[in-house]
Amino acid sequence: MNWHDLNRLHVVSNLKKILGKWFSLDCIFLDEKGRVKTNFLEENHTLYSDFFKNQVSSLSGREHFNSDLESVYNLLINTEGGIQIYPSSFESINFVCCNLVYENKIMGSVVGYPFVFNNKSESLEKLINDLMSEWKIDLVQIQKTITSLKVSDNNLEYLKDLISLVSQEVITFHEEINEREERIKDLSSELGSRFRFHTMIGKSANMKKIYRLLEKVSSSEA
């Protein structure tokens, strides 16, 4: 899987943007071994979730996230397919995931985070306040995070459809790359068999001169 090109794919970037604006979550890719293949810590990488942005800005927050992600991966590799929802270590905050399956083989996963089911509960606000204080986030950012999670749409079916669309685009991209590589390989093989030295035909005077020299060399014992 060409993760570098995949992360820059126009249609995937647009779907990530829609997921970010509608659901205030970020979309992350894992490879078949559960390693993160989205460079969300890079300075120029756009994060749509204020919660996630604040979480990964803190060492303890990143440790929490990596631990949760490992648990999610271990659950994902044992599922047959479809959209899966797994809880994080924080109450009400979840992962929405889908395996990337190509020719019956898991090539990686798409992970949406964070998704909140009960975003109107008072306990959520307390949770965010406690976590952000632990991560040393200022009060303005805390309030912004609470607001972003509270306005997040709870329409799970739309979210599932979008995550599924991301996975389909990833597999389509992978298929096209594989087909292109196979065509190049076949073409190289065909050209190799058709244009050997003895079948090469050159009509220019210089090419004919080279052929005559090559024939002399090829027939000599040296």
Where would I find each of the regions flagged by the language model?
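A short beta-strand signature within small-molecule sensing/ligand-binding domains used
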Residues: I83-Q84, S89-L100, I106-F117, E125-L127
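Residue-level signal for well-ordered, solvent-exposed loop/turn and beta-edge residues enriched
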Residues: R35, N104-K105
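AAA+ ATPase active-site-proximal loops
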Residues: L191-A222
